[in-house]
Amino acid sequence: MPKFNPKQMKDLERMLGLKTEQLNAVKVTIELQDKILVIDNPVVVKMLAQGQEVFSVMGSAREESKQQQKVEIKEEDVKFIMEQTGKSEKEAREALEKSNGDIAKAILALTEGENK
């Protein structure tokens, strides 16, 4: 890969009409249909070219299966579901975990049997 010095890069950007900005990203997550790619401590550059935002991400990626992604359950979500359904904290939390944190799905799962 050819090396460019910063001045050459700026000249090239100006010539091509690119505007770039380096972002202070901590982690980049790319969700695919069957897995998740996670890049910790990436170098992320945002470019604006012809009215389009383009992101360049550089770093080492690791793969995670979708099942490995643990959803963070917020206490406020648990309380909200308890209020809406009249269910216990344990039931509300389990429904949230099964629905991957989707509040609407959790409420539907807890109330479906009651509406039949």
Swiss-Prot record:
> One short Pfam family name for this protein?
NAC
Matching CDD domains, A to Z? UBA_AeNAC
Question: Please, one GO biological process term?
Answer: protein transport
Q: Which residues form the signal peptide?
A: none
What keywords tag this UniProt record? Protein transport, RNA-binding, Transport
The Gene Ontology terms for molecular function here are: RNA binding
Which residue numbers delimit the NAC-A/B domain? Answer: 6-70
Q: Which domain of life is it from?
A: Archaea
Protein family per UniProt: Belongs to the NAC-alpha family.
Chain's role: Contacts the emerging nascent chain on the ribosome.
* NCBIfam families to which the protein is assigned, alphabetical: archaeal-type nascent polypeptide-associated complex protein (TIGR00264)
Q: State the oligomer form and interacting partners.
A: Homodimer. Interacts with the ribosome. Binds ribosomal RNA.
Q: What is this protein called?
A: Nascent polypeptide-associated complex protein
What organism is the protein native to?
Sulfolobus acidocaldarius (strain ATCC 33909 / DSM 639 / JCM 8929 / NBRC 15157 / NCIMB 11770)
Q: What is the lineage of its organism?
A: Archaea, Thermoproteota, Thermoprotei, Sulfolobales, Sulfolobaceae
Gene that this sequence comes from: nac
